C-alpha cells in the first residue's frame, strides 16, 4: 500500500482500472459446465453458425436447436453476458438445448461487443436476430407470433431492452429483414440491470475506471443522459410490452431484483415476477442446482406466455 501511495497519479489510475477490470472479468458468466443427458441432445437437431446479419464483411452468427419434429414451435433467443465487452454465445448453449428439449426452437446469438462497436450495436444485433427467425419461420418450423428471449447479466439487460423497445427506430439497425417485426412475446431477464437512469449507475459510470457503462455507452450517465435513457429497459415501458420476468441469484446485487421496473410493469397490467435462486451468485448458470432451478422457472414462464396463451 505504501508503494501505491508513492506512484504518480496517472499510474494509480492505470492500476485501479486494471484491478477493477480483472475483478469484473472474474465475476462475468463463463461457459456453463453443467451437464445435459445424452438422450436429450440426441433428440434435437442443430444448425450451428447461421448468419443472421451482415455488416460489410462482418458476419453475425447464431446456433439453433429444435426437437426433431415438423410441428411449428415457439422460439426462444438466449443472449450471453460478459459486461457487454466479452463473452461468447456458447455460454448459453446448455440452457438453449435444455429449453429446446422442452418444445422450443432456441438460438444462441453472437453480438457486437463494446470493444468492436458501442451502443446501440449490441441491441441492434439482437433485433436483427429476431427478424431473421421470423423471416425463416417456415424453414425452421417456428411460430412467428411466439418468440421469447432470455439472457444473463449483460445478456439479461439486452433481453429486457429487446422486450421493452419494440418500435424504437434508433435501436432497429440495418441488420436486414426490415420488413419483419423485432418484437418478442415474453422475456426472462436474469441478473439484469433494467434501469440505467438510476442513481447507482450514475455513481458507477462517474468513475474514470468504470469498465462497463462508459465502455458500452460511451461516457458517464451525467455526460450523456439521453443515451442511458435510450439503453434503459425501464425507460421504454408501455402497455404494449410483453410479459417480463426477472431472475437473479440471492447473492447478487439487489438492483437485479428490478423492484421499480416490476412495480411499473404491474401498474401497466403486464405480467411480471421475480425468481430468487437461493445462495446463488451473479453468474449462477455454472452450478447444476442453480441451472435446474433456472430451467424450471424459465420454462414455466415461457410455457404460460408462449404456449398456453395461444391455445385455441
Range-by-range predicted roles:
Residues 72-82:
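Short beta-strand element of the alpha/beta-hydrolase
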Residues 90-108:
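Short amphipathic alpha-helix adjacent to the substrate-entry channel of hydrolases
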Residues 128-202:
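Primarily recognizes the serine-hydrolase "nucleophile elbow" in alpha/beta-hydrolase
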Residues 266-282:
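Catalytic histidine neighborhood in serine/cysteine hydrolases
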